[in-house]
Structure formats: C-alpha cells, structure tokens
C-alpha cells in the first residue's frame, strides 16, 4: 500500500484542476500545466481534491501509484507557488551574468559558456557567484539547474565549481610529502 499515493492532492483556492481521461490539467496564477497519468493508474477529481488509485494490485500499478500522485502534487504546487533552485559558484574568477536571454558563465575555461535559457524558465543572478533558477515545472527547473552545474561541478580538493545551495561537498586531503 502506497503511503504517498493514498493521500488525495488538495487543490487550493485560485487553482483549477480538470481530469479528462488520463490527462490532468491544472491552471493557477503562475500558469498552466498538464500531466498524462500512466494507464495502470486511475485519477479522479472530487471534493476539491485529486485522488489517484491503482487499476489493479500488480507491482507495476502499485509502483506508479505514488509516483503519479507526487507528479500531480508537483503540478498543483508549481502553478500556485512555483519552484526555484539556487546554485552557488566558488572559485577565483568564476562568475555568472545575464547576457540578454542567455546566461554567461566564466568557469575557468579558455572561453565563456553561453547557456540558452529554455522557455518557461527564469534565471536571475543576484550576485556574480549566485544563480537562481525558477519556473512552474519542477522537473524542468531541476534539469536546467543540473545542466548548469554540469559545466563545472564542484571538485573535492578546493571545492571550486558550481554547486547547489546547501549541498555538502565531500572534501579530500591533498597528497603528503
């Protein structure tokens, strides 16, 4: 029995949810999102909440049950509050700046990296060593943050590179003489 799946997703005021077949559409103040629920799961909207149930007791249906409920909950939270990920840049000369509709990263390479910002995502650089990625789709916000971090991930000796805010970097000791 899925502990996550059995809880219905409450839909707050100001957010409308419609279920058409296997598609859940959620509309809120920040925008509109939709998710196609897998065929092994039944979804319905009643009493101001979206509930998800497995069609049968097969292992696949039960494993998709909690996942589908979490996806629907992310849609509701995304259109009402939105999501954001903060990245920190550590290292001498490492910085980020907005250049029109692109993010310009100086990460110690012989060239600057121009990251084209995808639609539906907002990137802000409050400081040259800080990047804030925000949007309504949790998966896309995380994906964009991961792509930016991938250009120069934190290294274990000095901790230089791009890391998530609050991320612990396992540090190593240098070699001894």
Swiss-Prot record:
SUPFAM superfamilies: Ribosomal protein L6. One of its GO terms (molecular function) is rRNA binding. GO terms for biological process: cytoplasmic translation. It comes from the Bacteria. InterPro entries: Ribosomal_uL6-like, Ribosomal_uL6-like_a/b-dom_sf, Ribosomal_uL6_a/b-dom, Ribosomal_uL6_bac-type, Ribosomal_uL6_CS. Pfam families: Ribosomal_L6. GO terms for cellular component: cytosolic large ribosomal subunit. Keywords: Ribonucleoprotein, Ribosomal protein, RNA-binding, rRNA-binding. Belongs to the universal ribosomal protein uL6 family. Part of the 50S ribosomal subunit. This protein binds to the 23S rRNA, and is important in its secondary structure. It is located near the subunit interface in the base of the L7/L12 stalk, and near the tRNA binding site of the peptidyltransferase center. This is Large ribosomal subunit protein uL6.
């Amino acid at each position: 029995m899925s502990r996550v799946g059995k809880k219905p997703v409450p839909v707050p005021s100001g957010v409308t949810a419609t279920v058409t077949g296997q598609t859940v559409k959620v509309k809120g103040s920040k925008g509109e999102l939709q998710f196609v629920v897998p065929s092994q799961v039944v979804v319905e909207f009643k009493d101001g909440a979206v509930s998800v149930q497995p069609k049968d007791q097969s292992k696949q249906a039960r494993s998709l049950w909690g996942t589908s409920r979490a996806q629907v909950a992310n849609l509701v939270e995304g259109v009402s509050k939105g999501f954001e990920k903060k990245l920190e840049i550590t290292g001498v000369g490492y910085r980020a700046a907005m250049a029109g509709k692109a993010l310009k990263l100086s990460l110690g390479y012989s060239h600057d990296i121009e990251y084209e910002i995808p639609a539906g995502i907002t990137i802000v650089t409050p400081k040259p060593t800080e990047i804030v990625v925000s949007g309504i789709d949790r998966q896309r916000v995380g994906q964009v943050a991961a792509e930016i971090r991938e250009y120069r991930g934190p290294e274990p000796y000095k901790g230089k590179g791009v890391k998530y805010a609050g991320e612990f970097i396992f540090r190593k000791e240098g070699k001894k003489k």
